[in-house]
């Protein structure tokens, strides 16, 4: 249909105008009036699913990362305990605890307080570890305190148990060092030969001969397993039992001593 002069003017000023609904050329392009829900989902559902998928993936990756870090720290902690115990292990001692058992012992002692502080006092993991270590060593942690009765009760029990456990551990270490020193001294004494001066020092009855008892007593003195005072007390007890002064203890002497 040809345009009028006014339509041509409006076309030049405002651009193309939408065709009227009466134009028959529009009928072939008109879509049927069908609800859009029959063919596609609403647009906001796609956006919501798109937004939730990355969040779920992020949370899963973070949880997996935390689990891996916790497992790695546990392995490192136990490995360090086993390594330290293994380096200080004395091969001469026949009665030794398995290194893994010792590492687990120290792990349980420190980790129990670590969990109590974290879940009861509600502080961070690193602060919980420092707090538990300071509680065990009775140093204290002035910046934090237990505000609930449950936390105070658990802290009281944990302080008592952990302090005794650490004291027992230090006692074990001191005994181990003393035993190691004694074994080294005994090994050195037994590896030495006796000199002339030592011969006269070991000859208790001064008869110019060393009996097995005299030699054993002298070696025990050198190993510091028996002192001169201990030897004197043993001799006094022997003299009390040897009533006949024969240098030997008989059954008659024992019977007389028992009846008295």
Swiss-Prot record:
GO terms for molecular function: metal ion binding; potassium channel activity. Residues 18-31 have a biased composition (Polar residues). Ca(2+) 2 binds at residues 242, 246, 248, 253. Residues 1-34 are annotated as: Disordered. Residues 127-146 dip into the membrane without crossing it. Expressed in hydathodes and the vascular tissues of roots, stems, leaves and flowers. Keywords: Calcium, Ion channel, Ion transport, Membrane, Metal-binding, Potassium, Potassium channel, Potassium transport, Repeat, Transmembrane, Transmembrane helix, Transport, Vacuole. Signal peptide: none annotated. Residues 1-68, 174-260 are cytoplasmic. InterPro entries: 2pore_dom_K_chnl, EF-hand-dom_pair, EF_Hand_1_Ca_BS, K_chnl_dom. The chain crosses the membrane at residues 69-89, 153-173. Ca(2+) 1 binds at residues 203, 205, 207, 209, 214. GO terms for cellular component: plant-type vacuole membrane. SUPFAM superfamilies: EF-hand, Voltage-gated potassium channels. Pfam families: Ion_trans_2. It is a multi-pass membrane protein. Residues 190-225, 229-256 form the EF-hand domain. Probable calcium-activated potassium channel. Homotetramer. This is Potassium inward rectifier (Kir)-like channel 3. It comes from Arabidopsis thaliana (Mouse-ear cress).
